[in-house]
Curated annotation (Swiss-Prot):
Sequence similarity: Belongs to the UPF0173 family.
Xref: Pfam families: Lactamase_B_2
InterPro entries the UniProt entry points to: Metallo-B-lactamas, RibonucZ/Hydroxyglut_hydro, UPF0173, UPF0173_UPF0282_UlaG_hydrolase
Keywords: Hydrolase
Domain of life: Archaea
Record's protein name: UPF0173 metal-dependent hydrolase SSO0099
GO molecular function, one term: hydrolase activity
Keyword Electron transport in record: no
Length: 227
């Protein structure tokens, strides 16, 4: 059974059977996180980082140390920086860049384009596919036309989209991205109302997405849905 749990901000936990995949794991400094870092001790298999801003890189290094068998999936440039800076072993790294799928323990992973900034590598989105379900996590991004290609190539069932504005898409722009991506089962807003700088009314996103004929799914921090 595939499940998705939103942990507040951009942090997202995907579960496929007994495998746990976390994306952009800011936990300790996340005022919306429903769990403490210890919750993940020996409980993660794959850690995905879309880019190196602190609210997305988050607790990645500590989580890798708490989960010796876990693998890091990010751009190779970012992985190399983290490996050199924090002495992360090569065995913990899945080398990758924007492109096709890499399969790890039956879970298919890919990185996509994102329009944002990042110090040690280009920013990305992420695709996770297993058990017949495909999830697109857009990372931090503005609206860009190639989102249509992401939808056509990966055909996501669910799209997690930042809507907080200022640093990423706002609700209106995110609703346009839904039209481009065409998620088959739902569009999930993330990266909003964590702090005042990205405070928006999520109902604006809901109304816009519904009016375009798609299914908005608003989660509370800690809420789990079956995919």
């Amino acid at each position: 059974m595939a499940q998705l749990r939103w942990l507040g901000h951009a942090a997202t936990l995907l579960t496929f059977g007994n495998k746990n995949v976390i994306i952009d794991p800011m936990i300790k400094d996340n005022p919306l996180s429903p769990v403490k870092l210890d919750y993940f001790k020996n409980n993660l298999d794959i850690i995905i980082v879309t880019h190196d801003h602190y609210d997305h890189l988050g607790d990645t290094v500590e989580l890798l140390r708490m989960n010796p068998k876990a693998k890091l999936f990010a751009t190779y440039d970012l992985e190399a920086h983290l490996a050199e800076t924090y002495k992360i072993s090569e065995e913990s790294i899945i080398p990758a860049n924007v492109g096709g799928f890499v399969e790890v323990d039956g879970i298919k992973l890919a990185l996509t384009k994102a329009v944002h900034s990042s110090t040690h590598s280009d920013p990305t989105g992420a695709i996770v596919s297993a058990e017949g379900i495909t999830v697109y996590h857009a990372g931090d991004t503005g609206l860009f036309e190639d989102m249509k290609l992401i939808g056509e190539v990966f055909k996501p069932d669910y799209a997690l989209l930042p809507i907080g504005g200022r640093f990423t898409m706002d609700p209106y722009q995110a609703s346009i991205s839904v039209e481009l991506i065409k998620p088959k089962k739902g569009a999930i807003p993330i990266h909003y109302n964590t702090w005042d700088l990205i405070k928006v009314d999520v109902n604006d996103f809901v109304k816009l997405v519904k009016n375009k004929g798609y299914n908005p799914i608003v989660l509370q921090p800690g809420q789990t849905i079956t995919l």
